[in-house]
Amino acid sequence: MVLSFTRQRCLFFFIAPVLLVALSSCGSSSEDEASPGSVITDTDGDGEEVSESETTDQESSETGVTEPEITDPEVAGPDGDEQGDTDGTNPLDQPNILLVITDDQGIDASAQYSLSNDLPNTPVINSLARNGITYENVWGTPSCSTTRAALLTGMHGVNTGVLSVPGNLPTDSTTIQAFLSQNAASSNYQTAVFGKWHVDGGGGNLNHPNDFGVGHYAGHLRPNITDYFDWTITINGVEERNTTYHTTALVDNAIDWIDEQQSPWFAWLAFAAPHAPFHAPPDEFNTRGLSGTQADINANEREYFLSAIETLDTELGRLLNSMDPATRDNTIVMVIGDNGTPRDVLDNDSFLDGHQKGSLFEGGVRVPLVISGAGVTRTNVRENGLVSVVDFFPTIAALTSGTDNEGMHDGINFLSSFSADGEIDREFLYTDYDGNNALGQGWAVRSTTHKYIAYDNGTEVLYHLVTDPDETVDVSTTNSAIVSELRDFGLEVRGE
């Protein structure tokens, strides 16, 4: 694989808050087995094939999404000579990295997946997807803290101890920010986190992000804000009241910090949106005409939920437009969601009741991811290879220092997928959660076709995700070999 970071260097990953590649579509009705790296050709379940070049455009027309109003929408692969090693782990240039995380936005609430007829209008993220890659099979964890800890460390919950909410990152953990500063090849990187942190156990240490290697922190340390218009911001250990709309304030802080940088940087932008409390956004973002009364919110919660996603999409566009051309051309943006959609706002036409945030079902762990920009030579395509949130640590390490530091994390570097089809070296995905007895604590493993769940009460189930995307029929008794294979992988991850 060859990467180039010459002229157009903006790379975007969509993980449910701002630019990230959209997640796996196990809910597809296609009954054909899709191998890792293959392009999904039936995106809407109507049985008609869609070519790589048609997929995202078709989705945009179906959902009524308009083009983003950004200064330079061309965020596809760079022009100019190709650079870097053929294995994709040693780019000659050091790109800036913007990782955007949305809070509680599952794939049923992501326009890039078309699992629902009730979707947000996200032209900025849609543009990134058209000029990059939408990932179909990405696993986070069932909750906020557990996914964030996995992203930060590249380790699964069983190996960090962060298995529930609120998570408390062990003091000996090495975060990706700490790795960048400690590694000689990437020690010139400046790092910042804006927004939700949620891995300090609620202990009240105002310097917690900085203690874990974050150079600059501006956000909310308390797990969830109670008012998007009146909240407490912590800036490098100092608290103060903030009455600027939360989504806007985070982008304001990110813009100011990025504008000051003279060295390559890694910025982590973790929106609270669209997490509750649901509310009407400021008038300039309120395109749905929401009244904001409690009665209206109670009656139309998903409308308010989707409005928050649309607002963060607009503000993401403002952030991108704020960058001078040289900075933007050398910036990789990743956008991803942290977990599935909560029950109160879940589209039950996409996932069954109970298959939401907090569960080990696909509706709880599959997240959206979009990648676009520098070094991404595949554009307007859907990648079916398996990706885990623990894979971001080695991938970012490879982008910034030329090494994925194999051995210090549970992840796999998926940088090669940016320019080559079918090169994600992952056979299985793993996730775990101990935070919700009602929905079932335990751990899960999936392959390209099957999913195994081991609940803490000793129950084991197996689902065929191709023929049973709703995960309703347990086929464990007739597929003992597959059960053993997936169970063994999970036990290996767990050190059992």
PLM segments and residue spans:
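N-terminal secretory signal peptides that target proteins for export/translocation
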Residues: 1-8
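N-terminal acidic, proline/glycine-rich, low-complexity intrinsically disordered segments
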Residues: 2, 27-29
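Extreme N-terminus of proteins, especially the signal/transit-peptide cleavage junction
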Residues: 4, 17, 84-95
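Sec-dependent N-terminal signal peptides
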Residues: 9-17
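C-terminal motif of bacterial Sec signal peptides marking the signal peptidase cleavage site
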Residues: 22-25
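Ser/Thr-rich, Pro/Gly/Ala-heavy low-complexity intrinsically disordered linkers and tails
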Residues: 29-90
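Formylglycine-dependent sulfatase
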Residues: 90-455, 460, 469-495
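Phosphate/dinucleotide-binding and metal-coordinating scaffold of catalytic cores
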Residues: 465
